[in-house]
Structures are given as C-alpha cells and as structure tokens.
C-alpha cells in the first residue's frame, strides 16, 4: 500500500509502521496548523484514519477529522466536551504547539485516555531540556516507553537539531517494532531506515 508522508520529520511514516498499517485508526492532533503541509495526520487520514484536529488558528477546516478552533493549552468548552468523548484508547497523539506544548500536554484527559503512540515536539534546540524532561518523567510514570528520544531534524539546512520525542504504550504496540525503532539522538530519516 502506497503511503506518501506529509509530515516534517516522518512522524506519519513512523506511526504507520508502528501501527502495522492500520486503516481504521483514531488520532488527536494538537497544533495541526496547515491541513496538509507538515501535517502529521493527513496521510493517515488518506488511509482511513479519523480523529480530532485542534489549533489556535484556522487551517484544518477542510479535513476529514473534526476541527476545533481552540488553544490546546487552555481548552475552550467545545474542546473539553470533545475530550470527554474521544475513545479510551487513541491510536496516535501528536503534540506540536510550539511554546504551548507542555500546557497542551497537561490539559489532556490522561485519567481516561491511553495513547498507543505519541510524537511530541520538544524543541530542545531552542528551549533547552526542561519541558522535554517534565513530559518524559510524566509519561514514564504513566507506563509509556520512550522509543525515539531527541529525534533530529535538519533546520536550517545543513544543521541537525533535537526536535521531538516519540513514545509508545508497550501493552498496545508490537514489542518487536519498539525494539526495531529504539534510538536516541538520531536524524529522523535514519530512524525510518531501521
């Protein structure tokens, strides 16, 4: 099955592999921004996935998923209502809210939802490790496994910087795939070659 990535750092390709080419997945995309350009979920939608798209600015209204205009770090009433009705197990959570990522992370319904796979933009290269370390600590305490730490992107051209962390909930993911992609401080294209 042909899978064309739209993500900035291959997040959709990683999820596609880790979810074993699942075609009926559910995602939560916080910081969805543009409908297609650098979208972590658009290609998954093209393969049958559906979900919730949230951003503080318009841009994803024409997607198959449900778009909510809200600050994910300070959810409005509509977003809080949707959080009450998302599945107990969500296949993929993507967090890319720039400086509000930690706030969006903290606002999620962790008490009633388990996320099979998570990619979270940490921007360690520009913000330092404090927010990344807080999220890592909280996710580890909830039973998540850091599969790919400090995933590197090339930005600007010719410069490689730590950008994201990718997690899995081990009880919901093939352990051989966790082992296959296990890495730290690796350029995203090299992770996907494994």
State each model region's role.
Residues 2-3, 123:
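Active-site rim elements
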